[in-house]
Amino acid sequence: MFNKSQTLAKVDIEIHQAITQEKVRQEAHIELIASENYTSPAVMEAQGSQLTNKYAEGYPRKRYYGGCEYVDTVEQLAIDRAKVLFGADYANVQPHSGSQANAAVFQALLVPGDTILGMSLVHGGHLTHGAAPSFSGKNFNAIQYGLNEKTGEINYEQVEALVKKHKPKMIIAGFSAYSRVVDWQYFREIADTAGAYLMVDMAHVAGLVVTGEYPSPVAIADVTTTTTHKTLRGPRGGLILAKANEAIEKKLNSAIFPGIQGGPLMHVIAAKAVSFKEAMSDEYKVYQKQVKINAQVMANIFIERGFDVVSGGTDDHLFLVSFIDQRLTGKAVDAALDSAYITVNMNVVPNDPQSPFVTSGIRVGTPAVTTRGFNEADCADLAMWMCDICADLENEAMIDQVREKVTSLCVKHPVYN
């Protein structure tokens, strides 16, 4: 029998200390990594519940284990809410991550060796869209499209040419570092000309899609995948959505279980369900609108200060800054900003002369700071401080001054009040 008085602090002081330190870091540092956000206390409560104890292989009312009546309720709520939230006919809430959601789609619709067309990793795509180190690049004939060098936007002419030349079995639209609106309908039409499946990975913009701040691909693509964190602001996990197609739905379910996963994480699925309910609120609509406004404010400041923002701005929650002209590396900028308690990630940019371990750019995103309550004025100040540092990376006094300002701003806007 477990004694509830045996808290983490008593049982494992090392882990308790690390978690405590991370809590302090999250409160004291400004988080600008585009794929990160803060979940609500309700989401964390669900994820920390006794549901972690329950094995439930299969799907609601079709389990291979007994005692699933209550987790069936939880998973069905998550499924129903996801379908309503995104206007989907089908939803699978079991993927442990966005990458596993993507892997399941590949397993469901393709066979090894099939040709796929996805966005190049160095131009803003994701590892699972055909990058060489990924299963998607190793097991399939992966062809990559990129950006127009002049505009920094997707090169749709190149997409069309590659489709005609390679006749892919599946086209992947979506990104991990792209700041403009993707023309989902164009991808649908070009996929139809090749008789290809269209898969959209909307992991980065799912929250914006929910509230209409970014166009929805769900009714356009054959299958849409997403993570449940990032802009969606739920727990870390994956989600597969689709329009009605019984054959594809069966393949997707089988690809997740028993294809690539065993028992679902019922505590995480409960947390997903909670976050989906939160995303139906009026407050959530206000939040997503502010996410985009804040990103645009920050991008404009960087442009005004003479830095190269890829594509010249943003239509979503993120933007890329290229420091090729300044001969700075993303790694150095990342480190300098981190010293000022501002967290970003170095990122490859178009025509980057540096390796992916060094890069010439950074990716900046506003979901987390907007959750804290940052408004346009806060984000304008923050962008100015960042530009000050980027203009003089070796100025330790400048970094110290910015760190003090960051500390004051974080006290003004706590993550958890």
UniProtKB/Swiss-Prot annotation:
Catalytic activity: (6R)-5,10-methylene-5,6,7,8-tetrahydrofolate + glycine + H2O = (6S)-5,6,7,8-tetrahydrofolate + L-serine
Binding site for (6S)-5,6,7,8-tetrahydrofolate: L121, G125, H126, L127, S355, P356, F357
InterPro entries from the UniProt entry: PyrdxlP-dep_Trfase, PyrdxlP-dep_Trfase_major, PyrdxlP-dep_Trfase_small, Ser_HO-MeTrfase, Ser_HO-MeTrfase-like, Ser_HO-MeTrfase_PLP_BS, SHMT-like_dom
Swiss-Prot/TrEMBL keywords: Amino-acid biosynthesis, Cytoplasm, One-carbon metabolism, Pyridoxal phosphate, Transferase
Classification via CDD domains: SHMT
Subcellular location: Cytoplasm
Pathway(s) this gene product operates in, as recorded in its UniProt entry: One-carbon metabolism; tetrahydrofolate interconversion; Amino-acid biosynthesis; glycine biosynthesis; glycine from L-serine: step 1/1
Statement: the UniProt record of this protein carries the keyword Transferase: yes
Modified residues (N6-(pyridoxal phosphate)lysine): K230
Annotated site residues (Plays an important role in substrate specificity) in this chain: H229
EC number: 2.1.2.1
Enzyme class: transferase
GO MF, one example: pyridoxal phosphate binding
Pfam families linked to this entry: SHMT
Transmembrane segments: none
Main subcellular localisation: cytoplasm
Cofactors demanded by this protein: pyridoxal 5'-phosphate
GO biological process terms on file: glycine biosynthetic process from serine; tetrahydrofolate interconversion
GO cellular component: cytosol
Subunit structure: Homodimer.
Family: Belongs to the SHMT family.
Purpose of the protein: Catalyzes the reversible interconversion of serine and glycine with tetrahydrofolate (THF) serving as the one-carbon carrier. This reaction serves as the major source of one-carbon groups required for the biosynthesis of purines, thymidylate, methionine, and other important biomolecules. Also exhibits THF-independent aldolase activity toward beta-hydroxyamino acids, producing glycine and aldehydes, via a retro-aldol mechanism.
Xref: PANTHER family: SERINE HYDROXYMETHYLTRANSFERASE
Name of the featured protein: Serine hydroxymethyltransferase
Organism for this UniProt entry: Ruthia magnifica subsp. Calyptogena magnifica
Taxonomic path: Bacteria, Pseudomonadati, Pseudomonadota, Gammaproteobacteria, Candidatus Pseudothioglobaceae
